[in-house]
């Protein structure tokens, strides 16, 4: 079968179809969301094993379920979260969804309603932001990074955090109401590091106090390899939870969605991503 793999670069290759383990499902990808994870692999910042099938998150159709998985989900559309609590990072530590017939852990699936909107592809990042609300309520928070998890988390915290600061040293920027851009020091109680590339450097540059809360999105078990011991670290996983679909419907406008992501039919034009996210039409990629 055809798959997009890491092999001294990101390329399409013919690979052997993977077996369906007892708690896995076989899926066919419809739309794959390329993000900072794939950018980090492309630039060499994030190492993955050679021949690893990429694709951390997106919309898929469930084809077959393993023997320990409910058969009723077969034939349904689902979101694949970029992290499995049992097996680790999808498309990084285990094979991802950029294959004609991909296999992923069943605990990474969120079944979609029949009338789903393409904006639901942002589900993993919204789930992280909604969980962050419990940590930052009433506090000042600094968000580091210019990717989807940073911008969407900032958006979800408006009205919950006291003040929201965003440090983004990437070229592409999106303005959000209630979010202040910073380039130097400030007064915050909590740091959310949404950048895989430079968050430690920025923490040192902007300053952080012993005991400050450092919140990190959990996309891999093996990242980060270094954590400042003087900080109170909290990991936040993308999870299935109530309220995510409603939040996307009510708060993420078409205008904002189109500022954050762009659609593409070409792998070559999609990595590195020109916006925080690229929605790759996997059906067209594998048909060509």
What residues fall within each predicted segment?
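Short, hydrophobic beta-strand segments that form beta-sheet elements in well-ordered domains
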Residues: 3-5, 141-143, 161-171, 190-194, ...
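Short beta->alpha connector loops
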Residues: 9-10, 84, 147-148, 195-198, ...
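Glycine-rich beta-strand-centered segment in the early N-terminal region that forms part
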Residues: 18-33, 43-84
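NAD(P)H dinucleotide-binding glycine-rich loop of Rossmann-like/cofactor-binding domains
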Residues: 80-139
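Short, acidic/turn-prone active-site loops that include or flank metal/cofactor-
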Residues: 84-85, 169-172, 217-221, 239-241
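Mid-domain Rossmann-like dinucleotide-binding core that forms the NAD(H)/NADP(H) cofactor-binding site
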Residues: 118-185
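C-terminal hydrophobic helical "lid"/dimerization subdomain
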Residues: 142, 242-288
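Glycine-rich cofactor phosphate-binding loops and adjacent beta1-alpha1 units
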Residues: 173-235
């Amino acid at each position: 079968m055809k798959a997009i793999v890491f092999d001294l670069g990101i390329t399409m290759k013919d690979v052997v179809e993977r077996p369906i383990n007892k708690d896995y499902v076989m899926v066919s990808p419809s739309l794959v969301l390329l993000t900072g994870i794939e950018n980090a692999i492309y630039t060499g910042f994030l190492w993955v094993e050679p021949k690893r099938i990429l694709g951390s998150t997106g919309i898929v159709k469930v084809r077959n379920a393993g023997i320990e998985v409910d058969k009723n989900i077969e034939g349904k559309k689902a979101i694949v979260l970029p992290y499995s609590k049992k097996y680790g990072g999808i498309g990084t530590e285990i094979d991802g969804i950029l294959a004609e017939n991909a296999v992923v852990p069943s605990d990474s699936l969120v079944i979609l309603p029949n009338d789903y909107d393409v904006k639901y592809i942002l589900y993993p990042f919204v789930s992280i932001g909604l969980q962050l609300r419990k940590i930052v309520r009433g506090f000042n928070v600094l968000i580091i990074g210019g990717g989807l998890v940073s911008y969407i988390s900032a958006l979800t915290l408006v009205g919950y955090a006291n003040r929201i600061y965003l440090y983004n040293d990437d070229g592409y920027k999106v303005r959000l109401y209630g979010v202040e851009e910073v380039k130097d020091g400030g007064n915050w109680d909590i740091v959310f590091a949404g950048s895989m590339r430079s968050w430690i450097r920025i923490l040192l540059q902007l300053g952080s106090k012993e005991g400050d809360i450092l919140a990190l999105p959990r996309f891999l078990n093996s990242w980060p390899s270094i954590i400042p011991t003087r900080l109170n670290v909290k990991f936040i996983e993308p999870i299935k939870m109530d309220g995510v679909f409603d939040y996307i419907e009510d708060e993420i406008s078409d205008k904002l969605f189109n500022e954050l992501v762009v659609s593409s039919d070409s792998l070559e034009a999609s990595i590195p991503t020109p916006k925080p996210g690229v929605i790759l039409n996997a059906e067209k990629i594998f048909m060509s």
